[in-house]
């Protein structure tokens, strides 16, 4: 299934399923870091791989994510300085390491986890129609949730999606002043949102560019720059911009309408997926 020259000889998983949740800090001056955003760790493309998962929250989705890194299915092993500079020069200049491979990996982790959930929810395992209905339902809500998480994280920093994509001096100043991260926030919550929002188009891109295995990123510079072109083409599309504004409006109305603890469940969580199975 996976044709890769850097498959590990062994892969060991350590699961410490703590009850610690990923949540926004109470103090808006706190820079988002692994405490709020991360649930696992690994080193990609190692001969003897090790994966550590340290939260129960989203644990299986995180297993998929970290396994992608370990099996070298993304492009974390490539030299990314040029593509990062090109991204900041031609698309959005933010104070971020970018790590675009994290967005690619999180997209596929979300998609494959959704497939797993849909299969689990389908009572008759050979009922393809029911499975596809569940999958369509799940992916629809993951798209909505990704939009919500994107605008919520930006709002926490005092930014909107338009502040990110516009090239006027005010927007540039706001980005330079307000956008800060100590982990892959931009990759997890912003770029991943774009990929999930345009998942059909991105799946076609993967099918065209990745060869025989659709999720195994073809590790060439041409593929890297093609990936960047995909992002450039979709980041500023009207449909995405309009839906981020609708999500922001819903976020603000939700805060006003509901009180603790219900309000905090949705407005504070830093989960990256909303659908799960016990």
What are these regions (language model features)?
Residues 1-47, 53-57:
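Auxiliary, metal-adjacent structural segments of Zn-dependent hydrolase domains
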Residues 4, 19, 69, 73-77, ...:
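Short amphipathic alpha-helical interaction elements and helix-loop-helix interfaces
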Residues 52-61, 94-98, 102:
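Amphipathic alpha-helical protein-protein interaction segments
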Residues 61-74, 109:
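Active-site recognition of the HExxH zinc-binding catalytic motif
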Residues 125-278:
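Long, compositionally biased intrinsically disordered regions
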């Amino acid at each position: 299934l996976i044709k890769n020259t850097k498959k590990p000889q062994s892969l060991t998983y350590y699961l410490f399923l703590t009850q610690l949740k990923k949540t926004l800090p109470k103090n808006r001056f706190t820079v988002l870091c692994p405490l709020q955003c991360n649930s696992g760790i690994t080193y990609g493309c190692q001969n003897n791989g090790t994966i550590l998962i340290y939260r129960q929250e989203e644990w299986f989705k995180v297993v998929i994510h970290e396994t992608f890194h370990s099996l070298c299915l993304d492009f974390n092993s490539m030299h990314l300085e040029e593509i990062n500079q090109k991204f900041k020069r031609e698309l959005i200049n933010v104070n971020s390491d970018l790590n675009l491979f994290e967005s690619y990996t999180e997209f596929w982790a979300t998609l494959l986890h959704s497939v797993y959930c849909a299969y689990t929810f389908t009572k008759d395992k050979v009922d393809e129609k029911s499975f596809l209905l569940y999958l369509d339902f799940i992916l629809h809500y993951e798209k909505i949730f990704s939009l919500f998480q994107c605008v919520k994280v930006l709002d926490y920093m005092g930014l909107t999606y338009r502040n990110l994509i516009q090239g006027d001096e005010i927007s540039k100043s706001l980005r330079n002043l307000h956008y800060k991260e100590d982990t892959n926030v931009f990759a997890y919550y912003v770029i991943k949102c774009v990929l999930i929002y345009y998942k059909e188009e991105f799946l076609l891109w993967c099918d065209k560019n990745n060869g025989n295995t659709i999720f195994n990123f073809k590790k060439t510079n041409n593929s890297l720059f093609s990936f960047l072109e995909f992002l450039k083409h979709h980041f500023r599309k009207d449909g995405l911009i309009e839906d981020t504004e609708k999500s922001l409006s819903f976020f603000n109305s939700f805060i006003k309408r509901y009180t603790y603890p219900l309000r905090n469940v949705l407005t504070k969580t830093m989960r990256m997926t909303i659908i799960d199975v016990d």
